[in-house]
Amino acid sequence: MAVLALLFCLATFPSCILSQVQLKESGPGLVAPSQSLSITCTVSGFSLTGYGVNWVRQPPGKGLEWLGTIWGNGSTDYNSTLKSRLTITKDNSKSQVFLKMNSLQTDDTARYYCASVSIYYYGRSDKYFTLDYWGQGTSVTVSS
């Protein structure tokens, strides 16, 4: 009976399998120019071995900027313009994903978000995915 209920849930509401998903970012708040930024994203409600997690930021008054993704198998994709400064890692056992960015400048001031990937597919040369679950974000200011 429980199996039938689960199948009904999945068939009717595909997102129900991730209905309890939560993501929470924690960061330093203030970072001095030229220093490094480290942010942790702690997730619950799903396993990091089965889903990708993205890092996205939004500078004040500007749009969202994708930083990178770490996939369930541990492989990573990065924004090509920031790739040399970024490292994304994770600890599956602690359900945590880590963003490290080096050589910060004032234009790195932004709100930083982690977001989980629920659906993705490959195009001819690109990956496409939906970011259905977001953390509340953590504000980072780069200033001396």
Curated annotation (Swiss-Prot):
Residues 20-130 form the Ig-like domain. InterPro entries: Ig-like_dom (IPR007110), Ig-like_dom_sf (IPR036179), Ig-like_fold (IPR013783), Ig_sub (IPR003599), Ig_V-set (IPR013106), IgHV (IPR050199). PROSITE patterns: IG_LIKE (PS50835). It holds the Pfam family V-set. The sequence shown is translated from a differentiated gene isolated from a myeloma that secretes IgG2b. GO terms for cellular component: extracellular region; immunoglobulin complex. Transmembrane segments: none annotated. The lineage of its organism: Eukaryota, Metazoa, Chordata, Craniata, Vertebrata. It comes from Mus musculus. It comes from the Eukaryota. Residues 1-19 form the signal peptide. One of its GO terms (biological process) is immunoglobulin mediated immune response. This is Ig heavy chain V region MOPC 141. One of its GO terms (molecular function) is antigen binding. Keywords: Adaptive immunity, Immunity, Immunoglobulin, Signal. PANTHER family: IMMUNOGLOBULIN HEAVY CHAIN (PTHR23266).
